[in-house]
Amino acid sequence: MANSEKTAAVAEIAEDFRGSSAAVLTEYRGLTVSQLTELRRALGETTRYAVVKNTLTKIAAAQAGVTGIDELLVGPTAVAFVGGDPVEAAKGLRDFARANPALVVKGGVVEGKAMNADEIRRLADLESREVLLAKMAGAMNGSLAKAVGLFAAPLSQVARLAEALRAQREETAGAEPVSVDA
């Protein structure tokens, strides 16, 4: 690879790091070309999966301000540059790795934070951002309904008490007064 090609490759990888919400590093040794194509399809259009040279990736990461991945750049490496939801990409990699054990997740960077392979697996176990937001909205809606019930309850109790007192006075108005002799 000529120097100009290396410079262009470093610039492209650095731009991928800058434009991604996450970058997950994997070892792809043992996967066929058709399996890599299947993985790219499974990750979707917002994720670019690229086989990279470790040395060029280290330089590009440094240029992009990405730290904590140098120790992951050992052996054959491919990077999933995630443009969309990091959780969805982590799930895609996890599911593909279950079906194809040759794919090994090494770790990565999510929103500027370096993560090891276990942290990426935990990320894959999370629910998507949309599901979490929907659950939070549902919980808030339930809490608001409970709060309205709590505020309305004292008023309705006062109204029921006033009605009971009125009914009691109407009943006692027609009764003879009771005298207490001592």
Swiss-Prot record:
GO terms for cellular component: large ribosomal subunit. The keyword Metal-binding does not apply. Pfam families: Ribosomal_L10. PROSITE patterns: RIBOSOMAL_L10. It comes from the Bacteria. GO terms for molecular function: large ribosomal subunit rRNA binding; structural constituent of ribosome. One of its GO terms (biological process) is translation. The keyword Transcription regulation does not apply. Keywords: Ribonucleoprotein, Ribosomal protein, RNA-binding, rRNA-binding. InterPro entries: Ribosomal_uL10 (IPR001790), Ribosomal_uL10-like_sf (IPR043141), Ribosomal_uL10_bac (IPR022973), Ribosomal_uL10_bac_type (IPR047865), Ribosomal_uL10_CS_bac (IPR002363). Gene3D superfamilies: 3.30.70.1730, 6.10.250.290. Belongs to the universal ribosomal protein uL10 family. Part of the ribosomal stalk of the 50S ribosomal subunit. The N-terminus interacts with L11 and the large rRNA to form the base of the stalk. The C-terminus forms an elongated spine to which L12 dimers bind in a sequential fashion forming a multimeric L10(L12)X complex. Forms part of the ribosomal stalk, playing a central role in the interaction of the ribosome with GTP-bound translation factors. This is Large ribosomal subunit protein uL10. The lineage of its organism: Bacteria, Bacillati, Actinomycetota, Actinomycetes, Frankiales. The gene is rplJ.
